[in-house]
């Protein structure tokens, strides 16, 4: 008899797991509380402006392409992606700008401010990150390893210690090889992909730089939600039964097994396996009602990553100095990270990510206008949450900074504005305390590891998404879904022997 898989949540991790399980011959039902598939890969349109509500950068497209190839199909028949050789522009408080290109040589050619020594050091750093990327690909990515002990067993103690560079933090690894202060800050902010601090995260995450340089940075034509739509179409073609607007209220358990889910309609649906794309702690807390002692232990070890104050601005002018992806850096990177990740306050001078897809895709704003998305990282929801007044002051701080750094009269030109706070993120995606990127990567607390993909309490419960390994970001959460499918397939194959 065909076994039944229930997937809770239709984010990229959930939909990719559903696709792989269906491709493997299982009966798969996916329940998503919202009316769209993609989770944080969401869309907002108003007054002629289009905005990606969630992720705005596509990297490592081969991870997505694999899902289509398993069905002997081509992703290009479902969605169009475009490579962006000019990856982003960095603005610094003293007026310095640095353009990051795909390729160290190209970056050197486009930045007269960078010396020969700067480029040599940047190449040296890329070589270092390549070594880390290659070894993590062998075990962490290809085999879905979940713990330090598994990595040591797979690679051997000395090989793991040296090549994963567990001795240093990410920023220490950068500062050891890069002397240019602008490059130090720019490279450190690659940690944005996982919503953590480069001063706390382990050096193994330096691989993010090599991933982007080697695999490229891509734009999904028409908006990144089209990628989620493509995966949904593939899932339906493979026989996945998708229920949107369907909220799971709890997971039923018996001893060390999960037996099914209770929907908000009262209906009970049985399952042989459950895959939760809801974050691990909210799943245990709200769907299983795990005891307080075990929850507290998990919360200490797996603290949420950062959240964000997200502004979607329709602007009645154009700023020619902006690229597609932009970063407006802080005067003091260490202080910014300290305030967000340790003091848990709204930062005085935040580093701001600004995406302006209209630079590449003119369908995203009316002629002569621009669609600007602004995202500074801020703490996840605290026991004493930030107030409406706190957020209003922070909004002014953001606009003051952007105007000071070259976006002249930005306030005057805003004709449309939509804002998301951590509370909105928590409400819409049931994320842990409104975190965007799952679990924080911290060398001391968790060695940069997220939750394991297999539940430690229930033998047929699995997790996908940003709160489990291999981590946050679109390719990683998509990969987590594929890895969970591999684990279930391997388990079933073993049981049949």
Curated annotation (Swiss-Prot):
Its EC number is 1.14.99.-. It comes from Staphylococcus aureus (strain NCTC 8325 / PS 47). Involved in the biosynthesis of the yellow-orange carotenoid staphyloxanthin, which plays a role in the virulence via its protective function against oxidative stress. Catalyzes the oxidation of the terminal methyl side group of 4,4'-diaponeurosporene to form 4,4'-diaponeurosporen-4-al. FAD binds at residues 7-19. Pathway: Carotenoid biosynthesis; staphyloxanthin biosynthesis; staphyloxanthin from farnesyl diphosphate: step 3/5. This is 4,4'-diaponeurosporene oxygenase. Upon coexpression with Methylomonas 4,4'-diapophytoene desaturase (CrtN), CrtP produces 4,4'-diapolycopene dialdehyde, thus accepting 4,4'-diapolycopene as substrate. The keyword Flavoprotein applies. It is an enzyme of class 1 (oxidoreductase). Belongs to the carotenoid/retinoid oxidoreductase family. CrtP subfamily. One of its GO terms (biological process) is carotenoid biosynthetic process. Keywords: Carotenoid biosynthesis, FAD, Flavoprotein, Oxidoreductase, Virulence. It catalyses: all-trans-4,4'-diaponeurosporene + 2 AH2 + 2 O2 = 4,4'-diaponeurosporenal + 2 A + 3 H2O. It comes from the Bacteria.
């Amino acid at each position: 008899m065909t076994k039944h898989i229930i997937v809770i949540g239709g984010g990229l991790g959930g939909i990719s797991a559903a696709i792989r399980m269906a491709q493997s011959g299982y009966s798969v039902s996916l329940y998503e509380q919202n009316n769209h598939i993609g989770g944080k890969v969401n869309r907002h349109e108003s007054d002629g402006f289009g905005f990606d509500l969630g992720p705005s950068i596509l990297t490592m497209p081969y991870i997505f392409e694999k899902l289509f190839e398993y069905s002997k199909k081509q992703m290009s028949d479902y969605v169009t992606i475009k490579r962006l050789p000019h990856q982003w522009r960095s603005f610094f408080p003293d007026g310095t700008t640095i353009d990051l290109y795909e390729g160290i040589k190209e970056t050197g050619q486009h930045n007269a401010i960078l010396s020969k020594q700067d480029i040599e050091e940047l190449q040296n750093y890329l070589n270092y990150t390549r070594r880390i990327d290659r070894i993590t690909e062998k075990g962490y990515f290809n085999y879905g390893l979940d713990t330090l002990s598994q990595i040591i067993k797979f690679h051997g103690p000395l090989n793991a210690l040296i090549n994963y560079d567990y001795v240093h933090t990410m920023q220490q690894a950068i500062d050891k090889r890069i002397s240019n202060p602008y490059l130090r800050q720019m490279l450190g902010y690659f940690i944005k992909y996982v919503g953590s601090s480069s001063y706390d995260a382990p050096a193994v995450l330096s691989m993010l730089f090599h991933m982007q340089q080697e695999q490229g940075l891509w734009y999904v034509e028409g908006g990144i939600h089209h990628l989620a739509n493509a995966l949904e179409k593939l899932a339906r073609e493979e026989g996945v039964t998708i229920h949107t607007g369907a909220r799971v209220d709890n997971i039923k358990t018996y001893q060390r097994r999960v037996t099914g889910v209770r929907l908000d309609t009262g209906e009970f649906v049985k399952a042989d396996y459950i895959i939760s794309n809801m974050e691990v702690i909210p799943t245990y807390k709200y769907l299983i009602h795990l005891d307080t002692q075990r929850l507290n232990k998990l919360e200490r070890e797996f603290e949420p990553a950062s959240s964000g104050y997200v502004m979607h601005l329709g602007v009645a002018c154009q700023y020619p100095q902006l690229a597609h992806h932009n970063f407006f850096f802080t005067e003091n990177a260490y202080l910014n990270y300290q305030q967000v990740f340790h003091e848990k306050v709204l930062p005085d001078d935040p580093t701001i990510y600004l995406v302006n897809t209209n630079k590449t895709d003119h369908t995203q704003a009316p002629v002569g206008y621009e669609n600007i998305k602004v995202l500074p990282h801020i703490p996840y929801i605290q026991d004493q949450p930030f107030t409406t007044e706190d957020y209003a002051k922070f909004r002014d701080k953001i606009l003051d900074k952007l105007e000071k750094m070259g976006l002249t009269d930005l306030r005057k030109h805003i004709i449309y504005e939509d804002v998301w706070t951590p509370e909105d993120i928590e409400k819409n995606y049931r994320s842990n305390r409104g975190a965007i990127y799952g679990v924080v990567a911290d060398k001391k607390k968790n060695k940069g590891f997220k939750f394991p993909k297999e539940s430690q309490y229930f033998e047929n419960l699995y997790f996908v998404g940003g709160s489990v390994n291999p981590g946050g970001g679109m390719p990683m959460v998509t990969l987590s879904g594929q890895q969970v499918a591999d684990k279930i397939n391997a388990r079933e194959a073993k049981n049949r022997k």
